[in-house]
Amino acid sequence: MKTNLNYCIVLSSEQLAYLAGSKYGIDRMKILHQLIEAAVLEENDYAIKGFSTTLQVGQAILSEVDLSSKLDYDKKTISRVLDKMNQLRIVASAQSNRTSVHTLKCISAWMENGNRIDNPFYVRIKNRQEEGENTGALSNLSLIHI
């Protein structure tokens, strides 16, 4: 059965400016796109030799090497972009000796075949301001993938 999947993405002006920018031909949105596509929509056990975890809704498992080979970008470039995405709180990444778990913080929800799936890791813009996670002017941008 083919699913109809839409994404509710909320970004601050600073986050959007970073993702829209490009340096040395690197498309940062492509990297975010790979993470969004890899995110699970229900709890999922994951195991490879020497590593196992339970992925929650809104988490993706992709190593920097995997991202590098999928996008044909240098691994060091992927690492720098992910570091900046973490700094801007677009994602939160945790590395192990085998792979990385990326928690998507910019996705508020998914709509799958008309059913809303909330992201438990999403932090509302209002709460980001109160927590001091983002300073300066913020604007909401909701993108729906059709």
Where are these regions (language model features)?
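Conserved small/polar residues in nucleotide/adenosyl-binding loops
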Residues: 144-146
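A contiguous pocket-lining binding segment that forms or flanks enzyme active sites
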Residues: 117-140
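Short, cationic-aromatic polyanion-contact patches
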Residues: 97-116
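Short recognition helix of helix-turn-helix/winged-helix DNA-binding domains
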Residues: 1-57, 62-65
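Winged helix-turn-helix DNA-binding recognition segment
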Residues: 39-103
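Alpha-helix boundary/capping detector
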Residues: 61, 93-94, 110-112, 130
